Amino acid sequence: LYDVASDELIRLGMGYKYQPNTGRLFAFSSNKSRSKQADASLSSFRNKLSTIITAGITSEWFFANDKNDSWVKQLFDNPKKGWMLHNLGALEAFQRRTTYGHNLSERVWSIAKQFERHIELSLSIGISEGRSAADISRDVRVYLNEPDKLFRRVRNAFGNLTLSKVAQAYHPGQGVYRSSYQNAMRMARTEINSAYREADSIRWQ
């Protein structure tokens, strides 16, 4: 998912008339027509990420219920219907719930915006160094796992003042990674594991 979206955005960014010598960082919003293409690509990324996480939640919910169904059948020859309910209403409520005031869609949107900024910074560095789209794509894969490398290169290419502004805008908050990819992976794991525990807990109430 990240590789495909990265390649699309990098190819799009390479078509901009970005001038690193102005001291400004690359921004998709600097070109209105191409900005719409970037927005469409990011929207597709958000939808796919949401679908992956939602599918994982649903799969784990049913896995927990199937496990409990098996146990009930082993213990009782004719279990009551109420013991075999998969509580689909509770699943829908779980998917709609908010965490720290944000629902799943809003949290995915935040990850996508962080990813967009990550690509913009990578393009700023890559274009300033004359790197090809393929080179920048490889760089992005490294930065997604080691975001501090990206910040060091921003500092080296654009100076400490620009780095300071970037760091302020990019500060994700306590308990949040600087990497969109790492945040997406953690959110997926947390949501899917929570779905299993919630489904299991409801069955035993």
Language model features with spans:
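N-terminal leader/targeting and assembly helices and adjacent pre-domain segments
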Residues: 1-174
